[in-house]
Amino acid sequence: MTDIQSTAKVVVIGGGVVGVSTLYHLVKKGWSDVCLIERKELTSGSTWHAAGLLPLFNMSYSVGQLHKYSVNLYKRLGEETGQDVGIRPVSNIRLATNQDRMDEYLQYAGVAQTIGVEVEFLTPNEVVDIWPFAKKDGLIGAMRHPEDGYVQPADLTQAFAKGAREGGAKIYRYTTVEGIEQLDDGMWKVSTDKGDIICEHVVSCTGSFARKTGEMVGLDIPVVPVEHQYIVTESHPDILKRRANGEPELGVLRESDGSWYMREEAGGLILGPYEHGAPACYLDGPDEQSEYELFQEDIDRLMPHIESAMHRVPIFEELGIKKVYNGAIAYTPDGNP
């Protein structure tokens, strides 16, 4: 049984990328007397099955600043900690098939310029030059983020954990929070199956468990986990040939009106649809023993997105499916994860 400290300035609950990043940033701000509690293994909730995209695009100035900060941090975090985060700045192309969509991109370009995020506008022919497996039919243009791309979420989490530990933070895995109570002096008691911790602050980063965590302090946290699927395909000889010839990795391709993204993965492709009306899950919270959990895939639910992807990228129709990931992602009422 691992000994657990009895006091801390901050207790962070939840060992996904959000919780471990919070711990890392507290240490970087000079608060070394901090710890994190994770009921299972780090990343074992939603982080492990995330596709890891780094979308700089956001119409909000404040959220856009966070996205820019995050991408820049990930670029240097591996060197800082010695833990590779798997960042791939392969770019991101957002397609426009109508003027309303292009006007949205033009409006965003003003936000991007204010933030200091580089964007480019492409003609349909330029899209195909960069992403040769895409068809330009129906396109009026596109917007490209040259510095966008993806990261490996589990590796990123481990880099944050290493940086936090090096700064003095403690991480307690396989430790379950059983209660949170505010004491008469304003301090908090976090009760776990390995002992109690008295602390000044508690930070909940519990994802799909957020409602259960909130109930411990009398809060109704408006978070609903929903199912989110993405498809990983078998490899394709033409994609493998590109890599063998030393050509650059295909960037992230987004069909905004079709509500999907696609990127290269191990000689094949990943298709990530954003389903309208995706079913909610964990309505009563995940099982206490839930770890690295996936749900049964539902390809029929994805067919409109698959058909749209086949139209835009015909080789997608030729590819066998290697794996369908269907995992929980926690959403709030404003639609943001």
Indicate residue ranges for each PLM-predicted region:
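Beta1/beta-strand and adjacent pyrophosphate-binding region of the FAD-binding site
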Residues: 4-18, 35
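Gly/Ala-rich phosphate-binding loop of Rossmann-like dinucleotide-binding domains
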Residues: 23, 27-28, 163
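Glycine-rich FAD pyrophosphate-binding loop
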Residues: 27-48
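Dinucleotide-binding Rossmann-like beta1-alpha1 core, especially the glycine-rich loop
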Residues: 52-130, 257-262, 267-268
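Helical element adjacent to the flavin cofactor pocket in flavoenzyme catalytic cores
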Residues: 143-201, 209
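Central helical "cap/lid" subdomain
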Residues: 196-249
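Active-site lid/adjacent beta-loop-alpha segment flanking the redox-cofactor pocket in flavoenzymes
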Residues: 220, 237-337
